[in-house]
Design a protein with these regions (language model features):
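Beta-strand/beta-sandwich contexts
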Residues: 45-46
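Solvent-exposed loop/turn segments flanking beta-strands in beta-repeat/beta-sandwich domains
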Residues: 59-72
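Bacterial N-terminal signal peptides
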Residues: 9-17
Length: 705
């Protein structure tokens, strides 16, 4: 393995002259007016010893001098405190709590304008068990039965009351990876309030295949009315939350005329033909508002058009062999990603960016919703390693660049576009300082106008992390692992693609994480399966361990008893400013537990009752070997994060965990940080990745004192 630092400004970037200013925290922080309207998110649960632990949100809209009163049963028990959590040693489960907020600390002899939260009762335990309505299973055309388990979740405020609702994707037990044949059950989406009330159910039908790479759903307020919508891919037979076919929400006569009883699955359960559509649903009711053709279609066209040399099958674009699949079986062209991006500025309404392909051709389709209709903003197409183009709503090319060249740090010629550069996830944020979001698409980045920002050419990978990983460098950084030769991992400048650290390896580097786990070093630490131990952000190894490889490929322990920190999700959980980790014990159940870095190794971090996550409510992770939570986000309470797992004893409950560890630090809700909020929106996509902040928390907390 080789490690070195090298400046690499990709040729694709140089040719375009794309060198705007560096992004900063300010540029990735929306104005007060643009922040989600959230309530205090007050939560109470058993304290670590006796009593009740209460926590609540500090908002990004609050003044620097904001302070709080804590009320128990209508009586103030803590007066004008600065912290956003409080332990009531005399509290009990029978009592109720409210938070009174003062934007400026009032004088004792003067009345002050104040905001009073709703009253909450303490949870009975360290987690909340949310009942969910498990769908009935079924039998596939080949006679095999299946049932349902809770899979990925997202959040949005669908009714505008300042509290998030949960949108849950139910996966059938026969969901498939794109590389596998087989029928699947229908994909089902539910919406629940945090008290367990079900608002609606959407059934995407038999013509949407179930699997991690197919249904990518976005939950966000796209039209600026203060209420979140849902956007996802649909097809003939998809039913909205009112039980109506989504095709009836179209303004296109051909979409309205689709045969909703047709079954487009082939004899091995794949869907290679038929209508492909995109639908926006009303978040409160699940009602389909508008449905359009999905772009590009299987034959690279817009709507029902096909690219030159492609053809129709039974009236619809036929899956193209140019996607590059062996035997043309519907793999590479059926891999989707999605994200929410503020392409016109953080204070403007966002776009849905729906993506198709990353092993060869890469397409990113930006779509706007004005409250009534979905409209194309642009369609980016990286059609070869050397050529990219941008098309408008009619499919007309409005910008194109050909003949780009690019070389990797070792001098090998590599892709100069987003062709073959995407990952199993993406990231969104203003990386170039222009006030608009860009899309980090694996080893490449796409500008807010749909043009190519840069490409490192280092290829596809399973994981990437965008944040201010190195607070002493201007702008943001990306850490990514790679699946293809020369494999390995890299740390790069998120604006230019300049390679800061680079490791090569002999095999697929399938896991890697960037997180601030060690307070002795500024910035985030890096670890991945191509490098033994843990590195600081400058590339220095700060711990031995992990594994090393013999020339014949077998691995041996590098330090007896050492294991890398978990290569899954980072999380803010305890009271310090470093990040903890979500780990899993492995097969067959992938049971989750908390982990903390002690400076030399990762150690289990039990809950205050001495138990681990998996010992509470039969909690289990999802997505098989990826072993991810159903959702991780700052849902309520103070700035520490919540994590959701499903109850494997009945698959009919979600377990929501929140911390009860006091902290002295006051930090605005993470959901008011733009990069973090965008990360929660794309978290459910493909191989789920954790959300990251757009700033370095220890520095932010110092400013908030």
């Amino acid at each position: 393995m080789i490690e070195f630092k090298q400046l690499l400004v990709p040729a694709a970037c140089l040719l375009m002259g794309c060198m705007p200013t560096q992004a900063s925290e300010k540029q990735n922080y929306p104005s007060v007016a643009a922040m989600e309207k959230l309530d205090r998110g007050v939560v109470a649960l058993p304290a670590a010893g006796k009593g009740v632990f209460i926590s609540w949100r500090m908002l990004g809209t609050d003044s620097k001098n904001v302070c709080f009163d804590v009320e128990r049963d209508g009586k103030v028990i803590a007066h004008h405190i600065k912290a956003t959590n409080y332990t009531d040693a005399k509290g009990s489960a029978s009592q109720t709590y409210r938070i009174i907020t003062y934007q400026e600390e009032p004088k004792m002899d003067a009345a002050a304008q104040r905001e009073v939260s709703g009253a909450v009762k303490p949870w009975a335990d360290l987690y909340r068990s949310l009942p969910i309505n498990r769908p009935d299973g079924g039998i596939t055309p080949d006679g095999k039965s299946y049932s349902y388990t809770p899979n990925d979740c997202s959040v949005g405020d669908v009714d505008g009351d300042g509290e998030y609702e949960l949108i849950l994707k139910w996966d059938p037990t026969n969901a498939h990876d794109n590389s596998h044949n087989g029928y699947t059950g229908d994909v089902i989406l539910d919406c629940y309030k945090l008290d367990g009330t079900q608002l609606w159910r959407i059934n995407l039908g038999k013509n949407i295949r179930a699997g991690a790479h197919y249904t990518q759903f976005l939950v966000y307020d796209f039209d600026g009315d203060g209420k979140a919508e849902l956007i996802c891919k649909t097809s003939a037979g998809s039913l909205d939350g009112k039980g109506r076919f989504v095709s009836q929400a179209a303004t296109d006569a051909e979409i309205r005329a689709v045969d909703n009883l047709a079954d487009y699955r082939n004899k091995v359960g794949r869907i290679m033909e038929g209508p492909e559509m995109l639908t926006v649903f009303r978040g409160l009711s699940g009602e389909a508002i508008h449905t359009v053709w999905y772009n590009p279609n299987r034959a690279f066209g817009v709507g029902k058009q096909v690219a030159e040399g492609e053809s129709l099958l039974n009236g619809y674009p036929q899956y193209s062999s140019i996607w590059g699949d062996k035997d043309n079986y519907g793999n590479r062209g059926e891999r989707y990603l999605a994200g929410v991006a503020h392409l016109d500025g953080l204070d403007k309404n966002p776009s849905a960016v729906m993506c198709r392909g990353y092993y060869t051709r890469s397409y990113l389709w930006a779509v706007d919703f004005d409250g009534k209709e979905l409209k194309t903003k642009w369609l980016h197409a990286s059609v070869s390693p050397n050529d990219w183009e941008v098309r408008d709503a009619e499919g007309k090319i409005i910008r194109e660049v050909h003949g780009l060249k690019n070389r990797d740090p070792k001098g090998n010629e590599v892709s100069a576009t987003a062709f073959a550069q995407g990952a199993h996830s993406l990231a969104v944020g203003d990386v170039d300082g222009d006030g608009c979001d860009e899309i980090t698409y694996g080893s490449a980045a796409i500008n807010n106008a749909g043009t190519l920002l840069y490409s490192t050419g280092l290829g596809h990978g399973d994981a990437l992390h965008l944040s201010d990983l190195d607070p002493d460098r201007p702008g943001l950084e990306v850490f990514m692992v790679h699946e293809e030769y020369p494999y390995g991992s890299d740390l790069r400048d998120a604006r230019t693609g300049e390679i800061l650290l680079y490791h090569t390896d002999r095999d697929d580097t399938g896991r890697g994480v960037a997180a601030d786990i060690d307070a002795k070093y500024r910035g985030c630490e890096l670890w991945s399966i191509d490098v033994p131990g843990v590195r600081n952000i400058k590339g220095d190894q700060i711990s031995l361990g992990g594994f090393r490889k013999h020339e014949y490929g077998e691995r041996e322990s590098y330090t007896p008893g050492f294991r890398w920190p978990a290569m899954n999700f980072r999380i803010y959980w305890d009271g310090d400013l470093q990040e903890e980790l979500l780990a899993n014990l492995g097969r067959p159940h992938f049971v989750p537990y908390l982990q903390k870095w002690d400076g030399k190794k990762a150690v289990p971090l039990p809950l205050s009752n001495g138990k681990q996550l998996y010992e509470m409510g039969h909690s289990a992770s999802c997505n098989w070997s990826k072993a991810t939570p159903n959702l991780q986000a700052d849902l309520f309470g103070d700035w520490r994060e919540e994590v959701i797992y499903w109850d494997e004893s009945d698959a009919s409950h979600l377990n929501i965990f929140t911390t009860n560890i006091p902290t002295e630090y006051r930090v605005p809700t993470l959901m008011h940080d733009h990069i973090y909020r965008m990360g929660v929106a794309w978290q459910n996509v493909a191989y789920n990745q954790p959300p990251h902040l757009g700033y370095y928390l220890p520095d932010k907390a110092e400013k908030m004192k």
